Structure formats: structure tokens, C-alpha cells
Amino acid sequence: SARANAMQEACELQPSTMAAVLGLDNEVVETICNDTQGVVVAANYNCPGQLVISGEVPAVEAACAALSEAGARRALMLPVGGAFHSPLMEPAREKLAQAIESAAIVAPRCPIYQNVSAEPTTDPGVIRAQLVAQLTAPVRWTQTMQTMIADGAASVTEVGPGKVLQGLFKKVDRAFPTSSATLAMEEA
């Protein structure tokens, strides 16, 4: 896809990575990232107490050491090809923007909760802009789940294999109804 190719090219420009951080408040992680030399940012707000940071390899390593010293239960480097959802993906922006601009996007029947803003929208222009912004902006999954609950969602269904997102949702609100839907593909 255009997105994958553009991101791969951005990854090849500079060694970069991501790390999972467990057991610290968002503000502590953000402060340590800001205080670390080099590029390292909060990239995924997965659920309370679980973030992923993203950036230059030495900066992520230094942040992990500082996060461990600050009391993180874990600060674990992830086996990924780049610093996704960080400023290091900026070189991919133009190609992705061109691909998204050429795609047919119409107003959806129900609001789309995009995790750049954690807010619902039906505006095709906003949808396009946020699809591009997600390259360099953090995934605000925790905030998205909280907004969906506050907006009156009665339940959520995870589409695709596994139940990772359901598990994250349960860490925000254990009582909230979740389910999953998967289509089995026949082998040819």
C-alpha cells in the first residue's frame, strides 16, 4: 500500500524503534520523553498504565533506562522496523497525503472515532486530514475508548482476529460489553 511503502522509506532514513512502557502515569512517561536527548515521544496510549514510546534508537534506549529508574514495571524495546506515530515518519506524509486525497471517501452513516483526536466525525475532510496526521501523531486509544463511553456507546465489537483491543477496553472499563467478529477465509 502507499502508506506502507512511504513508512518503509521513512524508516530507512534513520535507525528508529519503539518500546512498551508499563506501570507509569502518562505524564511521567511524557516528561521523561521530553527530557531525553534526541527524538522520543509517546506514540500509543493503549490503556491506563500502558504506553508505547517511539523515536531514535539511542533516545528510546535512554528513555527506557530513565523510565525503569522512575519505577516502570517494564520498559521493553519492541521488535519493530521504525518509530511509528512519531515525528520520524514525517518524510512519509506527502506520499500518504497524495494517496488519501485520491481515495474516494464519503460521509459515513455513523461517526468514525479516529484515534488522532479521540473524537467522532462524519466529515470526509476531517477523516482525510486525520488519516494523514496519524503518521506522526500518537494513537490516543485510551482517550478514544473513554470518549466512546461518554458519548453513550452501548457495546463495542472488535473486528478481526484476536481480542487485543477488547482487552485494552476492559482495562478502561471492566464492565463495558465487548465482543469480537472474525470472518474465516477458505484456503484456495
State where each predicted segment sits.
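Alpha/beta catalytic cores of group-transfer enzymes, especially the acyltransferase/condensing modules
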Residues: 1-137
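Acyltransferase/transacylase module recognition
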Residues: 101-188
